[in-house]
């Protein structure tokens, strides 16, 4: 059940039987010469939609722009400041809390969103405590990185091995292609598959 394709009476009927929602959250950033810029958001949305259909759970609109400042050298990439993303998530959830929802699972498609999303959860609870006190509903939020779930990890190890990597991976490119088969891109890649790399920070270059 997608919120954006539902009517308010349908949502009202849903709220009579459930207080949960799935929230896809991704990013709008480069994914190499053949990966769609919306890959992270597309994948999160596709996974959330499938899970929502299977479990009969409401799926909210996708948060399509996330924390992608490290991709801004590539045309088309978009980003939010951490403070902006935190407030977007806070207001998004609190809007739904006003209607009676209390359980939120964020289906995440971008690693750069983790810190800000987690901080937003604290912001949500703080705001509810400050504004409603003892009358605040028992709101609970959970972040799930779809690509790190046990089943997906096992499948990727079987199908892609060391070529899976951590960004613009075969699994996410394949899922985006499944969602948008009319937008499959090709590019001359050398090598065809990049091995998994390591994340570095300033300490590695001292």
What are these regions (language model features)?
Residues 1-105, 109-206:
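Extended, histidine- and acidic-residue-enriched regions that form the cofactor-binding/catalytic faces
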């Amino acid at each position: 059940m997608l919120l954006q394709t539902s009517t308010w009476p349908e949502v009202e009927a849903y709220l009579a039987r459930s207080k949960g929602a799935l929230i896809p959250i991704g990013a709008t950033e480069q994914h190499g010469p053949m990966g769609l810029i919306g890959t992270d958001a597309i994948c999160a949305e596709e996974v959330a939609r499938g899970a929502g259909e299977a479990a009969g759970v409401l799926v909210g609109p996708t948060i399509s722009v996330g924390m992608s400042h490290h991709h801004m050298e590539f045309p088309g990439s978009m980003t939010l400041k951490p403070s902006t993303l935190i407030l977007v998530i806070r207001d998004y959830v609190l809007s739904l809390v006003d209607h009676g929802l209390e359980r939120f699972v964020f289906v995440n498609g971008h690693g750069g969103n983790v810190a800000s999303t987690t901080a937003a959860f604290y912001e949500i609870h703080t705001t509810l405590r400050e504004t409603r006190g003892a009358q605040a509903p028992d709101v609970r939020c959970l972040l799930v990185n779809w690509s790190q779930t046990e089943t997906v990890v096992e499948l990727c190890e079987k199908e892609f091995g060391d070529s899976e990597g951590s960004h613009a991976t075969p699994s996410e490119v394949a899922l985006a292609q499944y969602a948008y088969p009319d937008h499959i891109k090709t590019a001359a890649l050398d090598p065809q598959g990049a091995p998994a790399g390591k994340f570095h920070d300033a300490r590695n270059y001292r």
